[in-house]
Regions:
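Structural motif
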Residues: 3, 45, 100-102
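Short catalytic helix/loop segments, enriched in acidic residues and glycine
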Residues: 16-34
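Short, glycine/acidic-enriched capping/hinge loops at junctions between secondary-structure elements
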Residues: 13-17, 56-57
Length: 200
């Protein structure tokens, strides 16, 4: 299996937009880049975390595609990558010649702050939210390697450096390690400039 086209919309906040409203323009760009018509698509896999049931079916309906299997994958932040894996598998196993993988989510629907987790989750029952969990893992990483938080700040520096040249990036302004370390703390060691932004 090979990727013959890709498309996306700029990362950002799109209040009032729907899942199809976010995905359809990106899919159309991917189809154009691939030189593929919607009628050639043999299967669709849609990865998301918070879209609910039938997210992929709603997107496909808005694209005017019918009569193909649509699988929805809820795999948290790995939903899009999982969709790509499953679409490639459809091709490799000879089920279809052309498969469409979609990764889409709408995180601003929660109004900011931490993302909601299910109450049955053992970490949630202990009061853990994702920033706290990642902070614990970061503390352990630094401890085991004898490093300071400066090493983690380099991740923000690298990500922002790549964002400067990417017209689809949510943030396109560079940041220094000192700025990342001096930013408002979220859960020690990560600061606000070291946490994932909320967006679509």
């Amino acid at each position: 299996a090979v990727i013959v086209g890709a498309g996306m919309i700029p990362m950002g906040k799109y209040p009032g937009s729907s899942y199809p409203g976010l995905a359809v323009p990106a899919v159309l760009r991917a189809l154009e880049a691939a030189g593929v018509s919607p009628s050639e698509i043999g299967s669709v896999v849609c990865g998301h975390a918070f879209g609910g049931m039938l997210t992929g079916q709603r997107i496909v309906k808005d694209l005017g595609i019918g009569g193909v299997p649509v699988v929805n994958v809820d795999n948290a932040c790995s939903g899009g990558a999982s969709a790509l894996h499953l679409a490639a598998r459809d091709i490799e196993e000879g089920r279809v010649e052309v498969a469409l993988a979609i990764g889409v989510d709408k995180l601003t629907q929660f109004g900011g702050g931490t993302l909601p987790l299910v109450e049955e989750d053992s970490e949630v029952q202990r009061g853990m939210v994702m920033p706290a969990l990642y902070a614990m893992r970061a503390q352990r990483y630094l401890y085991e390697r004898g490093e300071g938080p400066e090493i983690l700040a380099q991740v923000s520096v690298k990500a922002r450096r790549h964002g400067v040249a990417n017209p689809f990036a949510q943030f396109r302004k560079p940041v220094t390690a000192d700025e990342a370390l001096a930013a408002r703390p979220i859960a020690d060691p990560p600061t606000v400039l070291q946490c994932c932004p909320t967006g679509e």
